[in-house]
């Protein structure tokens, strides 16, 4: 696999011919909606392991390496019969390696809204370890709202993907509710009821474990939250169920803000089997335009996290969506949420050139809509996902967690499968 950035006048025919593959292979690897139209700057997965370049007049290994964007030492390594790299002849076959041998195994979690389609499930299960089904919303009395997800659980298990039950403190208004969290965390009777309901659901619905996603907890509930997690772990562990906990992305222990203060990385890391760090939403619906998961910010969070949590417990969050902001942005404005496929198609629709922010390692573009309004779109693509896998490797993390898997984006799974051997925890 290589990642190719399209140039003006590029066509799939030209690209396929250059790399010795087929148009249909490129279309499939990228789920391209219209093979006749590409955006300038679009990052495409080219599904090839290596190609054979026939040397012509003026060729050098250096020029060949630049043409194919493959390091010179890799080309030399792939051609042991070349005794003098400075001396190649016309007509000589030069093998250019593109294959990535997965350097390590990894766990991949995918958050799935319960209405995920059967087709999408079949597309994503080869690349997942866990499927965390979102979500059981808890009530103030310890009961939970009903979730109709048995078919998703069954499909996950049928494809050796471990289903996780997700519980949240999402209130009746549809947002994370601090007061609801406070009630649950400070009433032992309510906790006992909730834990019994969780255990019953795990058993009756054939879940593998539970994921706790309590957000916007009051800072004063920090210790109560840890006590609840410990109590939950003690209740489910004897039955073989696992506990994962989703936490906000922090840079330091004492980071202020209701999103962060109740999430004690060290204490949670001691209790949970896995910690899912939600490293996304720097750019968010109601915020100013920016990358959703900037590489530099994500890396800073992970560099702190591994000092508090065992790296082999950490699943680093990656977003699978895009935002479109109307400019100029004013406080109170909201962005339109898109899928990554929609973001790329919109760039093509308006003839926008896709740009690359090297600090954030994220793609974006500007366009003018039919009403004359200027927009900026930030999204994820093969190149940005590839950069994120470097963080997983560099810090030796357990793996990655996708929010969400409901909208299939082929390049995400291509990057995962070319970088990692996906671990299975059930048969």
Question: Which residues are covered by each model-predicted region?
Answer:
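Glycan-binding loop/region signatures in secreted carbohydrate-active enzymes
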Residues: 166-181, 320-388, 418-427
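Conserved, mostly hydrophobic/aromatic
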Residues: 131, 212, 275, 316, ...
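Active-site groove signature of glycoside hydrolases
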Residues: 132-135, 195-224, 274-288
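Short, acidic/polar
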Residues: 112-127, 188-203, 257-266, 380-393
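Substrate-binding surface in catalytic domains of secreted glycosidases
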Residues: 140-147, 222-227, 231-349
